[in-house]
Regions:
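N-terminal capping segments
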Residues: 1-87, 136-138, 149-151, 195, ...
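Short, solvent-exposed coil/turn elements at secondary-structure transition points
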Residues: 30, 146, 154, 184-187
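Activation targets extended, charge/polar-rich intrinsically disordered C-terminal tails
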Residues: 74, 78-115
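Short alpha-helix capping/helix-loop boundary micro-motifs
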Residues: 113-123
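Loop/turn positions that initiate beta-strands
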Residues: 129-131
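Catalytic Cys-His active-site segments of thiol-dependent hydrolases/isopeptidases
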Residues: 135, 141-170
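Low-complexity, Gly/Ser/Thr/Pro-rich intrinsically disordered linker/tail segments
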Residues: 169-213
Length: 213
């Protein structure tokens, strides 16, 4: 199975952050907040059942898409397209056969970083766009120029672009310091294989982690 190019992963993540209405919904990999999906996701996880979070989900408009941190990455890799009429926004949950053929399995944030290659706690300025950035229970996508895309209930409560504190704060962005970074095994980095990030790629155009980030 051909893997998604890292450039494509970055562009899709940035597109979601900039051009779609999103909401942090635990266990959701891009579903539009239709009445049926609101019922589904206010019953699927104790985090979503909490009164305040359930109220947010119920108040979301039908053109809002739900994600959590690792499910943002999985949703993109599973073909999310922004469809407002498909249950998972166009993403397709992988079959056992698809996973055997190389598709991304349904792993949590910690499970994903455990499968990444070249995982390191240093070398932040040498990251290439499309790498995963991780802290316990939470994961995001490095997009270049010292920025990441992450879905978190913190700050804007949605898919958002933030500064990677390990590289440095950036004006106009909230800052998160991560613990490790590495290359996602279901992503093809051949388009970013030579040398560190130059910044030129930034801003073009059911989770098992805990939501305390």
């Amino acid at each position: 199975m051909a893997h998604m190019k890292s450039k494509t992963l970055v562009e899709k993540a940035v597109d979601i952050a900039k051009n779609y209405k999103t909401l942090y919904v635990m266990g959701c990999f891009g579903s539009p907040m239709t009445a049926a999906n609101k019922t589904r996701y206010t019953q699927n996880h104790s985090y979503n059942k909490a009164a305040a979070r359930a109220a947010m989900i119920k108040a979301a408009t039908s053109d809002t898409f739900g994600f959590d941190c690792v499910n943002l990455i999985k949703g993109i890799l599973w073909g999310w397209s922004g469809s407002k009429i498909k249950t998972y926004g166009g993403a397709t949950y992988p079959t056992t056969a698809a996973i055997s053929a190389g598709a991304c399995p349904d792993v949590g944030a910690d499970g994903m970083i455990a499968r990444c290659t070249g995982v390191s706690t240093t070398g932040w300025t040498s990251m290439v766009p499309g790498e995963a950035v991780w802290m316990s229970g939470h994961i995001g996508i490095y997009i270049g120029d010292g920025l990441a895309v992450e879905c978190t209930p913190k700050w804007e409560n949605k898919v958002q672009i933030t500064a990677v504190g390990n590289i440095g704060a950036k004006a106009g962005y909230n800052t998160r310091t991560w613990t490790e970074h590495g290359r996602i095994p279901w992503v093809d980095y051949s388009d970013h294989s030579s040398g560190p990030d130059t910044g030129r790629h930034a801003e073009r155009g059911h989770s098992k982690g805990r939501p305390d980030f």
